[in-house]
Amino acid sequence: MQIYIISYLVSICFWIWIIMKYDKFEHEPLKTILFAFFIGGLISSLTAGIFNALFSLLINFRFAPGAAGEMSIGKSMLFFAFVGFNEEFFKAAATVLLIRKMKGFNEPADALVYAMSVAFGFSVFENLEYTMRLGLASFYIRQFNAVPLHIGLAAIWGIGIARAKYLHQGRYFRTMFPYILVAGFFHFIYNFAPLLMFYPWLSLLLPTVIAFLLIRFAIRKLKRYSEDGPFSNQLICRHCNTPNSLYAKVCKNCGEKFHLEFYRQCTSCGTKVDLQVPTCTNCGAEV
């Protein structure tokens, strides 16, 4: 039992540290991240788990080898397509429920921080079930595929949350839905593709590669949103990574033109101003 507890604590500390590390300029409070991690993870894992179970009963599908029910390719495809969308939907819904009116949600990077925290919480609760059923070996394997998968997928619909708040006047469902579909599709590929592999090592390698690419995407996106956010006092070139002043129009090193997804620059003082705001929040000039 002690090794279980230590393993989970180390995992939680590591992934929370990863999430906080790339929220570079205005760190979210640890207690708020842990709140999203625990409450959001618990809510989403319970609701998604209930609907997963109901759907498996509806189509008479059992994933466990030797269990009653059929496990044909067709039913597997249908079930994992449902699971992919279902789990991403409830993780996204729990995140919006928790943060949409939060005062600390004051830059686009925060959407990714809390989305990834909720998704990590989801993966921890999910891993408890797998570890109790299959043993500690499954826990360690899932640290290299399932956990980064959930965190990486959260960055996809986390982008939708950021765009809903900062570009679409808080129309969360309409804005997020396409991103949830994309995340659900990758989740489906992760779950279903290994069933088509002829070699056991390929069925383990493929999900790990997918998870690695997704977590790499998530970290890059979080880093970019943080660097482009209102609390950064410089512009970072996406092409050569050179820091530039807030007044820069092009990179001083490579000449790449700057483009901010959520902000425009005040020509008077260089402040990054929300696209939905007509005047600079710092000097009052029209932008």
Over which residues does each language-model region extend?
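Hydrophobic alpha-helical segments at protein termini of multi-pass membrane proteins
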Residues: 1-286
